[in-house]
Design a protein with these regions (language model features):
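Glycine-rich hexapeptide-repeat left-handed beta-helix
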Residues: 3-35, 40, 44-45, 49-60, ...
Length: 147
């Protein structure tokens, strides 16, 4: 059974604009949806945008803490922990059983491997492998985690 806060916003358009010939900003429609797994916990003021070119997906048994943002086209695997004030930008993929600790920013199109950990206050701009601990600004590899 999913526990989704009343203040969570799920399925709104993502933030994508292009300019026309005059320079005016034109909003780009997002035509895909959000697929939610089972046994989720989605906290207060979480936002999960629908996809632009694929569904945004939250895997089974994943827990998302208050004030987190999940952008369009993101895929989060099963049994992940996404802590408070995390921003996961467009088209990021997070592998099963991974954890992203508070106040992290994950740049667009980054891939985070399974069973990996992102330390608090990190800015991730590079792909993270399976079973890796990363942290810092910018985030860097710290160590391999036990399997």
């Amino acid at each position: 059974m999913n526990k989704i806060s009343e203040t969570a916003k799920i399925g709104q358009d993502g933030f994508r604009f292009d300019r026309d010939d005059s320079g005016k900003l034109i909003e780009i429609p997002h035509e895909f949806g959000v697929k939610l797994g089972d046994d989720l916990r989605i906290g207060e003021f979480v936002t999960i945008d629908r996809g632009r070119w694929r569904d945004t997906v939250i895997g089974d048994n994943t827990k998302i803490d208050h004030h987190a943002h999940i952008a369009h086209n993101v895929i989060i695997g099963k049994s992940c922990l996404i802590h408070n004030f995390v921003s996961i930008e467009g088209s990021v993929e997070v592998g099963d059983f991974s954890q992203i600790f508070p106040h992290c920013n994950i740049s667009p199109q980054v891939k985070i491997g399974k069973n990996s950990i992102i330390a608090s206050n990190s800015f991730v701009k590079d792909d993270v492998g399976d079973f890796e601990l990363w942290g810092g600004v910018p985030a860097h590899f710290i160590k391999k985690l036990n399997k």
